[in-house]
């Protein structure tokens, strides 16, 4: 096995199979990686590679000179090199969580290795994680920093807030990328036709986005095969135009690679130069997708695609744009279309529009995935999540989120109008996500990889200073449009925190008032309690004990089904749960009463393809458990007969619906937060429809909890 950057990776099939077998496997892997690298062009890099459409138009330049443009290009070159190549390609892609990437994947990785999750039900221990289980006891021993997080609830809450903020900013990216990409592409129509007004461009852009959002429910499988060719055409044509501009306008542009031009730029422009960082930061837009989309592609494929095509394409395209602008210093307001030669103007307009649509689709799909992960882990109110492809598990769609995104995207276009105002808002999202990644990645280095503090500091200090400078610059844009992502992120964070707080209080109440097996036996021994025919799936949120709603149910209904299975849906801070560990069954003691835990990770499909299928899977696991477990008080044949008779009598799914009753003596914080939670709980979907239970088999039992 190979140990690489803290993750363990099994040998490939060709290793150890002889020289010929090894060469065949290596050749096969090379072609597979190249094909995956080609596919990443249409999914991963859409936002990054289309950034030349709006970087220069988003800058607030005032009488720029040749020296200014050389300094700006030098800043963009080193930003792409340091953040794109060094940070993401060389370092961040190694901080995966079982192949999944992104800020929340790093958070889940930290929670497992240092046991710093907030809710006990969300923690994962060594026996549940094959990576942790395979490590030695010394490797699993927490570091000093890990112990600090374990002992400080405040530090753990801050860490959760940082991870949640990263998710909220990514959702903000899903609002702004479609708006700025499509608007910047369609704005090219005003070049040949100056009489076309900006409101017409905005209306066309809004119409395209509305059509794109309305098509989301059909999935992208039928058209996704076009994404990579479109982005490949864009990726390879823009640098060709860039080379033409370099030769034609300014052959010496690459002298700007020298950091001297950055120093000279800031010394010359001082405060204005610092403020211009709010525009240059957009050159790295979409780089976070390299890490966030790691679960859909291999690390090597993303590295190959970025280093062989995306990075050279952006370097040459920006060099060509800058070379053109040095000779046409006042054309920065339309810095992309002005540098496109007239003979290829309309073909490039078509390619740019299609590329902007593909980039928008990539961010919309990423937003759906983030929302799905949050719902699965119970950090976000339940919304409908539909899998639009039978072959691609990660292809999901949420109707509620889709229409909210559509309204916000169209509102951004019509409300902000120009790309410069949207660019101000966009810069805040871009750099905040990257700064959060830097912080979490440093924690991963120290706590998990056990990187010496000196080496971790060599990573953290330069990137924190560079990204901190960008953050300070984009914060000055808050009055000019930068407030939008903050408003969206704060709203989302309030929703997630309110939901989390209510779920935590509910969990604490259930743990305090849980029903023990002894108490269940006493309830069933009462003469008025009858065992009625049927198979009952009784859903609970706790593993150790039974939900207090059970006592409420038995006392009021005076009955319990002959076979009752208490089902706990347990979300783990892992990407995926092995199928063999998905459903766990155990006997609880009383006749016909069993416990079942359904485990899933944040990248798993929560739905088990319909209620009948869930009943069949759990029943099948229970039958196997009965046959293998010889410690029962009754014979396996007798228990099997009872289970079959109960199944034939009818299946019912029972879920408790506990509501908070906030009394007059409750504190002001509880009144606000629990009232907000009750509002969210009232408008969100029930857990049973999310699992696909048939309507006629569902029963909900209400119970009030006085605070």
Curated annotation (Swiss-Prot):
Gene that produces this protein: HAK17
Species annotation: Oryza sativa subsp. japonica (Rice)
Cytoplasmic side: 1-34, 93-157, 216-222, 298-305, 365-402, 449-454, 502-707
Glycosylation sites recorded in the entry for this protein: 60
Family according to the record: Belongs to the HAK/KUP transporter (TC 2.A.72.3) family.
Chain intervals for the UniProt region annotation (Disordered): 1-25
Record protein name field: Probable potassium transporter 17
Principal place of residence: membrane
Function according to Swiss-Prot or TrEMBL: High-affinity potassium transporter.
